[in-house]
């Protein structure tokens, strides 16, 4: 008796399904879909092969390309950090890299590199205080220093955070463009972490970004379920000659999965969070209908008003003027119950505890963090500011001040 062929012949992707459908078992999952007898899902989850989910993937890809002006859009299941590691394991293997470290979450690049022994060499340029005293604000490494270091070291890849969540710092467009021009001049690529950017979406073409990493839960008001990785023309060209050092986080493979969906079919690498991605698609479409420019303006205005509120109360910002992010406000404190967020919890607010920067800040560095993400906050700015003001009135009654909702002055 002849033995069965092993390994079996696998289908060629993308697989294009016929148009014929029939009612699914549960109307709230896939009402026009097929009865579920695959080996991947049950009737309670949307199948990745379904016509419905194929539309979800195409819609997400289209919106990501539209907003970021990207050549390619890739979804990597997991979270934003999975996307960071996928990028590192795709483009930084045995390469020379340079990291602009503005705090704990750009220190994460170094943690990923060290854990996986990924690059051949890593240079780090840290944020630093702009003055004396333990409450002096921080600014990123001067752009002249960054450009000089790139020309000297000639890194293959430069990694930077658009918004650093640990200190509430944002890189201006001109800063990013200067980094991009410098690394492109030495033949390298520019990778930008936009996971904490909120609605301050970056134009990859204008800012010269080659790889942009984002996630659903901050800028897109979605449930965390994946990383979004956008590629420029240069990155899309170069990825074909790279090999990932990860199976689950193989960025090129996940790119091929998305391209299969874009071609009108589907493909499989690992199980995707189909229901969470469906909800993400819905809120992305909601944001598009409302207007991307309008949402971005709301993000900036909300950040300005909250920073003005804090400034009026004498609460010092960790980020220096000119680098203050509108989506994350991080402030100094000497009160351990504010640093831990305990006092805000007592007022019904879930804020975030302060974290170190890994930028030589010293042992007396104490902060607390306030996130200003999501359509509910952005569409209701005065209500959002009012919630914070009421909590501060009770937490810091001696420092209570009249309503301060005018935008803080920003340097030119």
Identify what each model region corresponds to.
Residues 217-308, 312, 376:
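Active-site C-terminal subdomain of aminotransferase-like
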Residues 6, 10-19, 362-412:
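PLP-dependent enzyme catalytic core of the Aspartate aminotransferase-like
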Residues 205-217, 227:
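Conserved active-site segment immediately N-terminal to the catalytic lysine
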Residues 38-83, 108, 112-114:
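Conserved N-terminal alpha-helix of the aminotransferase class I/II PLP-enzyme fold
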Residues 311-383:
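Conserved C-terminal alpha-helix-loop-beta "cap" of PLP-dependent enzymes
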Residues 1-51, 65-68:
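N-terminal "arm"/small-domain region of PLP-dependent enzymes with the aminotransferase-like
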Residues 82, 92-156:
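PLP-dependent aminotransferase-like
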Residues 133-198, 211:
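Active-site phosphate-binding strand-loop segment of PLP-dependent enzymes
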């Amino acid at each position: 008796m002849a033995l069965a062929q092993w390994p079996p012949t696998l289908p060629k992707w993308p697989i294009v399904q016929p148009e014929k459908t029939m009612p699914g078992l549960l109307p709230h999952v896939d009402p026009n879909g097929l009865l579920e007898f695959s080996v991947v899902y049950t009737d309670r989850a949307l199948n990745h092969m379904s016509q419905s989910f194929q539309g979800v993937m195409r819609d997400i890809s289209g919106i990501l390309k539209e907003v970021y002006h990207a050549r390619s859009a890739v979804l990597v299941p997991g979270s934003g950090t999975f996307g960071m590691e996928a990028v590192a394991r795709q483009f930084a293997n045995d390469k020379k890299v340079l990291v602009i470290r503005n705090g704990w979450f750009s220190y994460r690049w170094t943690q990923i590199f060290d854990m996986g022994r990924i690059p051949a060499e890593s240079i780090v340029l840290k944020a630093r205080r702009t003055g004396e005293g333990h409450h002096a604000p921080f600014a990123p490494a001067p752009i002249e220093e960054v450009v000089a270091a790139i020309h000297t070291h000639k890194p293959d890849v430069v990694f930077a955070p658009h918004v650093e969540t640990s200190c509430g710092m944002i890189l201006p467009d001109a800063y990013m463009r200067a980094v991009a021009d410098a690394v492109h001049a030495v033949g390298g690529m520019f990778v930008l972490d936009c996971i904490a950017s909120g609605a301050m979406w970056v134009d990859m073409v204008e800012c010269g970004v080659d790889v942009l990493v984002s996630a659903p839960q901050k800028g897109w008001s979605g449930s965390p379920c994946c990383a979004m990785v956008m590629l420029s023309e240069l990155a899309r060209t170069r990825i074909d000659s790279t090999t990932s050092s990860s199976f689950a986080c193989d960025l090129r493979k996940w790119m091929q999965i998305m391209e299969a969906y874009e071609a009108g079919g589907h493909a499989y690498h690992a199980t995707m969070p189909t229901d969470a991605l469906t909800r993400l698609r819905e809120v992305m479409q909601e944001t598009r209908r409302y207007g991307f420019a309008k949402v971005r303006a709301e993000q900036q205005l909300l950040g300005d008003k909250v920073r003005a509120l804090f400034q009026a109360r004498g609460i010092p910002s960790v980020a220096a003027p000119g680098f203050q992010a509108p989506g994350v406000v991080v402030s100094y404190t000497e009160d351990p119950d504010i640093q831990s967020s305990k006092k805000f919890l007592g007022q019904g607010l879930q804020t975030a505890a302060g974290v170190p920067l890994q930028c030589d800040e010293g042992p007396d560095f104490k902060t607390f963090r306030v996130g200003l993400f999501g359509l509910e906050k952005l569409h209701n700015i005065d209500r959002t500011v009012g919630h914070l003001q009421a909590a501060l009135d009770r937490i810091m009654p001696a420092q209570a001040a009249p309503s301060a909702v005018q935008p803080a002055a920003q340097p030119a």
